[in-house]
């Protein structure tokens, strides 16, 4: 964001915008809204999580492939910590990922804490 706001106010607005972007991306992923998820990433963005270190667009592609293989997951997010770095930002957060499946005829949910 740019404008004539005092720097502290601008920083708070930028942190809020990044936090909302992270939430929109996660909800889009959990609901399978792939185009909306893709819109959350710049082409040169980087995603570093437990199973991938790639660009944002590659992360979306691989997430969609997982969903197409019926690997479903839902995310419960912790607080989002945003660090502003000139024209970029770093968002960090913990999450719990719930993965439902059937094991020997019994429905189970495995929860991964990150």
Regions flagged by a language model, labelled:
Residues 1-31, 39, 43:
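Short, low-complexity N-terminal intrinsically disordered segments enriched in polar/charged residues
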């Amino acid at each position: 964001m740019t404008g004539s706001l005092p720097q502290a106010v601008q920083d708070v607005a930028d942190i809020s915008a990044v936090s909302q972007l992270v939430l929109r991306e996660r909800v889009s992923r959990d609901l399978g809204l792939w185009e909306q998820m893709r819109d959350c990433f710049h082409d040169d963005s980087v995603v570093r999580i437990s199973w991938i270190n790639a660009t944002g667009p590659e992360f979306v592609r691989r997430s969609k492939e997982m969903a197409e293989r019926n690997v479903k997951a839902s995310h419960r997010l912790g607080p989002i910590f945003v660090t502003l770095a000139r024209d970029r930002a770093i968002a960090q957060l913990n999450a719990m990922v719930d993965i439902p499946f059937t094991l020997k005829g019994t429905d189970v949910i495995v929860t991964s804490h990150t």
